[in-house]
Design a protein with these regions (language model features):
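Amphipathic, oligomerization/interface secondary-structure segments
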Residues: 1-178
Length: 178
């Protein structure tokens, strides 16, 4: 439990900055498109709808989708081929496990690390990781997806190596020598 959450926190540390960097780039791109005009109402309405869809307002502050921020973090720092190789070296059954088995206690979907569409792989990976994390930390009575200590440990143990190698790549990708 603690290992998974600790590795998740490595990625979570970068969520806000990566999410806002992505929004800023997308806004700049939309504003500088040749077909965009700040004088055309339909262009502005479309632009506003885009912004509203990308962010949430809660308690008078701007928030974002944590799962989207996780996906963006993975896209920025994770080399899927390297991740697959590291997981295979650790346990050569895990890559096929991730692609064929859901995380039953969380509803975490399959994630085919060998899939041809990197965007789809990162989305599936983010969903699997995020749903698993949520089932672990939001284990209210009555919730469908929740982690049960001891009972679900044998399932969680298969998710830890993936989180470890992801955390390691993020740490290496964000490190600098002074």
């Amino acid at each position: 439990f603690l290992q998974y959450i600790s590795y998740y926190h490595v990625a979570e540390h970068f969520f806000e900055s990566i999410f806002w960097d992505d929004i800023v780039l997308r806004v700049k791109d939309r504003l500088t498109q040749p077909g965009f005009s700040y004088k055309r109402k339909k262009d502005l309405v479309s632009f506003i709808k885009y912004i509203v869809k990308a962010i949430d307002v809660r308690d008078e502050s701007l928030t974002f989708s944590e799962q989207t921020a996780l996906r963006l973090t993975l896209e920025k720092y994770i080399d899927l081929n390297r991740l697959k190789a590291e997981i295979d070296e650790y346990d050569d059954s895990l890559v096929s496990h991730y692609s064929s088995a859901i995380v039953s206690f969380s509803g975490g979907n399959t994630a085919d690390l060998q899939g041809p569409d990197q965007g789809a792989v990162f989305s599936a990976l983010a969903a699997r990781i995020y749903k698993t994390r949520c089932a672990m930390v939001h284990s209210k009575d009555g919730e469908k997806a929740r982690y049960m200590p001891f009972k679900d440990d044998h399932l969680l143990v298969k998710e830890i190596p993936m989180m470890r190698f992801i955390a390691e790549q993020i740490i290496i990708g964000t490190s600098s020598i002074y």
